[in-house]
């Protein structure tokens, strides 16, 4: 039912836009593009909890993400996009389809581009572009669930001169999967700079994560996050570091009746080096303290390393090893994974 509703809504939205624009079938297709992106892997997972094998241990094939996007340009100022997101949900043991993007864009100038609807948020997609290996693993803040990549709201971005850019968003706070209305809006922003091959950025978030609703549970705490990134991106190699510090960054903490605060922080170091036009070595290491106040002994240490193969335009493969270890007093969860990851773009 949810899949049919999402797909039907997307189709109806584009049909209505087509009618409003008054464009002929030929001119409509001339100004419309369809794109796709798939992240998939075939791997073996060895997951243990306090020394005992646990799910999802085993060998298998996964499609982590499948995006289908439709872009239409009405004129030099206005355009629109609808992008669906296919993924597997372990909660219901089934696949689901969401609208990741559904927006109308107005480009007033390079310094001001406004989008209304669901679209990329300021931080995670920016870091993904710098990192370069999203199909292998999420970026630091996304992997640790203190940030997400898209949400519903009002978004603005632009370039300021030759070196600076910005992005800001006033959003519902529940993420793109849940467009529910809330009493107030959350806010996320980023200011970035690029000098030759050096990239620097700072960002932040504040809000109730979509939990502040009329007649709902009280939300005494406010989720906040501060982000920073510095990276060198050259012709053959790149190296960078990402950092975050977050307070009360979960729905449970925002609604905590005891008004108990919790803090988290972490960093990621990543890099890659292109050996030949086809093969590239890459890797990253992360360390996170996910609950510095309530569970100060808890620590998450993660790394991956691999070699990627650019098969042809739009198709890449990577042989990868991953290790993720979460420890606290008396407990240890370890996840080791090895396999082949792929990204397909068109």
Located regions from the model:
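Cleavable N-terminal export/targeting peptides
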Residues: 1-27
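Hydrophobic alpha-helical segments, especially transmembrane helices
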Residues: 3-4, 191, 285
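Outer membrane beta-barrel
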Residues: 27-49, 55-173, 182-188, 192-202, ...
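Outer-membrane beta-barrel pore domains
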Residues: 28-30, 39-57, 75, 88-94, ...
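Active-site-proximal beta-alpha loop/turn segments in soluble metabolic enzymes
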Residues: 169-178, 207-215
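Short histidine-centered beta-strand/loop micro-motifs
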Residues: 179-180, 337
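Interfacial loop-to-helix transition and helix-capping segments at the boundaries
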Residues: 180-184, 221-223
């Amino acid at each position: 039912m949810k899949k049919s509703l999402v797909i039907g809504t997307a189709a109806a939205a584009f049909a209505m836009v087509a009618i409003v624009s008054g464009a002929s079938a030929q001119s409509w297709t001339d100004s419309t593009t369809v794109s796709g992106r798939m992240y998939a892997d075939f791997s073996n997972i060895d997951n243990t909890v306090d020394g005992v094998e646990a799910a999802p241990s085993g060998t298998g094939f996964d499609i982590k993400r499948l995006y289908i996007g439709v872009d239409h340009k009405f004129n030099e100022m206005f355009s629109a996009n609808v992008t669906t997101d296919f993924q597997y949900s372990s909660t219901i043991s089934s696949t689901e389809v969401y609208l990741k993007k559904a927006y109308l864009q107005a480009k007033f100038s390079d310094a001001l581009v406004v989008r209304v609807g669901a679209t990329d948020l300021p931080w995670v997609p920016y870091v993904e572009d710098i990192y370069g290996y999203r199909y292998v693993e999420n970026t630091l803040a996304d992997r640790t669930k203190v940030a997400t990549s898209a949400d519903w709201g009002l978004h603005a971005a632009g370039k300021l001169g030759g070196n600076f850019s910005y992005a800001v968003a006033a959003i519902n706070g529940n993420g793109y999967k849940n467009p529910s209305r809330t009493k107030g809006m959350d806010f996320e922003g980023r200011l970035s700079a690029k000098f030759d091959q050096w990239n620097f950025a700072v960002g932040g978030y504040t809000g109730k994560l979509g939990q502040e609703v009329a007649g709902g549970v009280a939300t005494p705490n406010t989720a906040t996050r501060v982000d920073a990134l510095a990276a060198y991106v050259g012709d053959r190699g790149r190296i960078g570091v990402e950092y975050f510090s977050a307070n009360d960054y979960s729905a449970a903490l925002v609604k905590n009746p005891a008004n108990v605060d919790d803090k988290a922080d972490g960093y990621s170091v990543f890099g890659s080096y292109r050996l030949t036009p086809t093969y590239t070595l890459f890797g990253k290491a992360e360390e996170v303290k996910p609950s510095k106040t309530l569970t100060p002994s808890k620590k998450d240490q993660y790394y991956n390393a691999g070699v990627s193969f650019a098969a042809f335009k739009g198709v890449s493969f990577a042989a990868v090893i991953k290790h993720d270890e979460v420890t606290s007093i008396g407990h240890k969860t370890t996840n080791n994974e090895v396999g082949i990851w792929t990204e397909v773009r068109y």
